[in-house]
Amino acid sequence: MKPNFSKGLIPAIVIEEGTKDVLMLAYMNEEAYEKTLETKRTWFYSRSRQSLWNKGETSGNVQYVQSLYLDCDQDSIVVNVKQVGPACHTGEKTCFHYQII
């Protein structure tokens, strides 16, 4: 089974192996998905830069892919990772650290 990239990008929800904490949300195009499968590290597509990026390539805060889950519509994916260092560029463990209610 493979994601449906007919719209170009799919959301990739990244969770931490063990805790299942949601670490971040990013987007993958087909090339990022294939590179993720090939390298077992997360690759995403930057909508602002319009280019691929490898999580942790410059910061060292890499994500090692443990498993991938495809949703029922085949248009979003959950990436289960072993996270090295913080996932968020702010230095927080997760990008979801602002509590609203």
Swiss-Prot record:
InterPro entries: PRA-CH, PRib_AMP_CycHydrolase_dom, PRib_AMP_CycHydrolase_sf. Mg(2+) binds at D71, D73, D75. Signal peptide: none annotated. Zn(2+) binds at C72, C88, C95. Binds 1 Mg(2+) ion per subunit. Binds 1 zinc ion per subunit. Pathway: Amino-acid biosynthesis; L-histidine biosynthesis; L-histidine from 5-phospho-alpha-D-ribose 1-diphosphate: step 3/9. Keywords: Amino-acid biosynthesis, Cytoplasm, Histidine biosynthesis, Hydrolase, Magnesium, Metal-binding, Zinc. Its cofactor is Mg(2+); Zn(2+). It comes from the Bacteria. One of its GO terms (biological process) is L-histidine biosynthetic process. Its EC number is 3.5.4.19. It is found in: Cytoplasm. It catalyses: 1-(5-phospho-beta-D-ribosyl)-5'-AMP + H2O = 1-(5-phospho-beta-D-ribosyl)-5-[(5-phospho-beta-D-ribosylamino)methylideneamino]imidazole-4-carboxamide. GO terms for molecular function: magnesium ion binding; phosphoribosyl-AMP cyclohydrolase activity; zinc ion binding. GO terms for cellular component: cytoplasm. Belongs to the PRA-CH family. Catalyzes the hydrolysis of the adenine ring of phosphoribosyl-AMP. Homodimer. This is Phosphoribosyl-AMP cyclohydrolase. It comes from Bacillus cereus (strain B4264). The gene is hisI.
